[in-house]
Amino acid sequence: MRDVALPCDGEVVGAVQRSAADSPHGDVVVCAAGTLPGELHKLWRTSAPGGYHVEYGYSCMGYEIAGGIGVKMARPDREIVVMVGDGSYLMMNSEIATSLMLGVKLTIVVLDNRGFGCIHRLQQACGGAPFNNLLADCLQGPDGPPAIDFAAHARSLGAQAENVKTIPELEAALARARASKRTYVVCIETDPRRTIDEGGWWWEVAVPEVSARPEVRAARAKYEEARRKQRP
């Protein structure tokens, strides 16, 4: 049992920027999918062109590490920080080995909420029952959900890697990652349900008009109310 609350993604973003005094000028953050693009959009601070590299077009899960290699090749003078959720990491992680073969150093922060936390929250916000997004809600064998050690996996590909539990531990690990000359992976568990405020804007996600679930009908009423407040 943990003796501390799990951090949310926004708190991890803050820790990444605090881990280097010149982060707004020297870092390039790379991201693509899940909760992180929205959190980075609100929280990441950059004072130099190209310091914010997020694949918004299709939110391609798995783009992050491969994209980070390209960014580092284009900007070898900058510190490249790849921020990726556990879901995206599982979809395409082999480019860690490629980064080592090419001698392209990345700092990779894996935020492990044990599933697709962003989609889980959207599902709940639309009145749906938890289904197949978090590992705990998926079909499971007799041994339960997989206990994936992302740091051990990254080390098996040749990277330096470690697991941390708290924000202070994360900041210390990031200092070690920044000092390293090879790809370094830092993994931290995050809360799949907690996030920061939306930033003052409504995200329009349609809700079914007809449902037997009272939660869906309540979500539909809120959706229609928000639609009425939109500009014509």
Question: Which role fits each region the language model picked out?
Answer:
Residues 1-49, 55-57, 93:
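Cofactor-pocket helix-loop regions in the catalytic cores of large enzyme subunits
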Residues 38-39, 43-232:
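Thiamine diphosphate
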